[in-house]
Swiss-Prot record:
CDD domains: LipB. Residues 40-218 form the BPL/LPL catalytic domain. This is Octanoyltransferase. Pathway: Protein modification; protein lipoylation via endogenous pathway; protein N(6)-(lipoyl)lysine from octanoyl-[acyl-carrier-protein]: step 1/2.
Amino acid sequence: MIRSNKPPENNCLLYNKGLMPYLAAHAWQRSLLRQRIDYPNLEDVLILLEHPPVYTLGQGSSLEFLKFDPNQSEFEIHRIERGGEVTYHCPGQLVGYPILNLHRHRQDLHWYLRQLEEVIIRVLAVYDLKGDRLPSLTGVWLEGRKVAAIGIKVSRWITMHGFALNVCPDMTGFSRIVPCGITDKPVGSLAQWIPGITCEEVRVHVVQAFAEVFGLELVDS
């Protein structure tokens, strides 16, 4: 359990999962979101997991950012309700799905996106790495390389989707897309700065940073 200075009613259920198919995780998020719309007093949730190789496209994203025929892809492709363009998930990338009731935090989507970035920036600081924000863009960069992508969906101020931090993934899948539709910014992973780093060790720091940034007490579930 990671404790913050907030009272116990600010519990957040932590689900530390391993490799999970994308559609299973998506259905789980939708179920948790619906429960919290119907019962607003339910606790916040943070899911941490990894996905098998999969491409996802935001609700308004363009197929022009795929460098292959989507009808002949070796990996799954799913168009989902988050914002943003195409991104790639695979093992070695730590994905976080917060299901938060922003009525208990702040009803401000820009604030929420900046808070998610702050979580990643604090994790990088543990390794003496300086994460950067870029004007008008969402995500976190290291020395000009994007190491964390963020895309969210909010319904009645309940959040779903979240962040994807490249820890030690096979980066070849990114070469088949224009990640997040950004043509002039390369993608990076923490392993390029910290050889041997693993998602397991990074999970601990993500949990700590998330608790601090959102003022929550994370409870293993």
